[in-house]
């Protein structure tokens, strides 16, 4: 009886591991073979190097950016969906009610443009072609590939089709992540109210009282400073945003070439996995 129990447990474990292994492999990108997709004008070979970086060879820029959107969605779809939701203030659709405050905050700072068509119409024709092709590549992958990455299946969420406005919102989200003025303005206003202009200026010497007028648009009906700061802090933690970028310059008098040296080290959250950058060769 004991042997039968042991054998039964082993069988259950083996079957469980096999099922889990199969479940985890669903949605893993397949970089081999060939595909026939709508939207391309000609054949586009895509070679992956040992690091998995795609090398896209296309006859036109439109085809190149279509393929870029397709391969990026193939490799990073959940990360892209998360950023799309953050830019639109719809994180609660993915992560539940706990994100409602963050969504309200994101919508308050208006990352998504109110009139994206007006902005898009002012872009040069070449940029329009690139953006449209990139969007079409993403959406083609979403529509054609039924096997979603495990994150979607665990959360019971399906990716949305992309628009140009989504891209604009993500660009503004990236800019907001790299700035700290929002938080500093609110903190300074609190200090100014409690300590007075002169003492507050000692702590923030680069601020001027005239800059306080920028906060008038919030109005009395909006959340208080403390709540706004808390919401911004919560969101930065969720997005993995931390300060620390730095720049420095060396005088030409101290360089071998006799010319000044300028260095920049933007800390664009490179410690996160997956990282903020997607390497590709077009």
Where on the chain are the PLM-derived regions?
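Substrate-recognition/specificity elements adjacent to catalytic centers across diverse enzyme folds
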Residues: 20-261, 266-277
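Glycine-rich phosphate-binding loop of nucleotide-binding enzymes
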Residues: 282
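Positively charged n-region of N-terminal signal peptides that target proteins for export
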Residues: 1-5
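Hydrophobic membrane-insertion alpha-helices, especially the h-region
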Residues: 6-20
């Amino acid at each position: 009886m004991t042997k039968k129990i042991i054998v039964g447990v082993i069988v259950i474990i083996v079957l469980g591991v096999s099922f889990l292994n199969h479940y985890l492999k669903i949605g893993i990108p397949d970089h081999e073979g060939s595909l026939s997709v709508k939207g391309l004008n000609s054949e586009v070979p895509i070679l992956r190097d040992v690091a998995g970086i795609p090398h896209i060879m296309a006859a036109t820029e439109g085809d190149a950016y279509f393929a870029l959107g397709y391969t990026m969605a193939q490799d990073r779809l959940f990360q892209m969906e998360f950023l799309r939701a953050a830019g639109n203030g719809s994180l609660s659709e993915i992560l539940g009610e706990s994100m409602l405050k963050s969504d309200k905050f994101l919508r308050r700072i208006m990352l998504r443009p109110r009139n994206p068509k007006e902005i898009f119409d002012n872009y040069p024709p070449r940029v329009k072609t690139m953006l449209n092709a990139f969007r079409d590549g993403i959406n083609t992958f979403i529509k054609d590939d039924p096997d979603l990455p495990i994150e979607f299946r665990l959360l019971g969420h399906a990716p949305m089709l992309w628009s140009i406005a989504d891209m604009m919102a993500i660009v503004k989200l990236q800019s907001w992540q790299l700035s700290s003025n929002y938080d500093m303005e609110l903190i300074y206003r609190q200090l100014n109210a409690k300590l007075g202009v002169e003492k507050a200026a000692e702590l923030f010497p680069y601020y001027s009282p005239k800059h306080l007028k920028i906060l008038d648009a919030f109005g009395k009906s909006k959340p208080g400073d403390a709540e706004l700061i808390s919401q911004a802090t919560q969101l930065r933690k969720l997005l993995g945003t931390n300060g620390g970028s730095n720049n420095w310059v060396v005088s030409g008098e101290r360089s071998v070439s006799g010319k000044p040296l300028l260095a920049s080290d933007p800390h664009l959250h490179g410690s996160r996995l997956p990282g903020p950058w997607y390497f590709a060769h077009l």
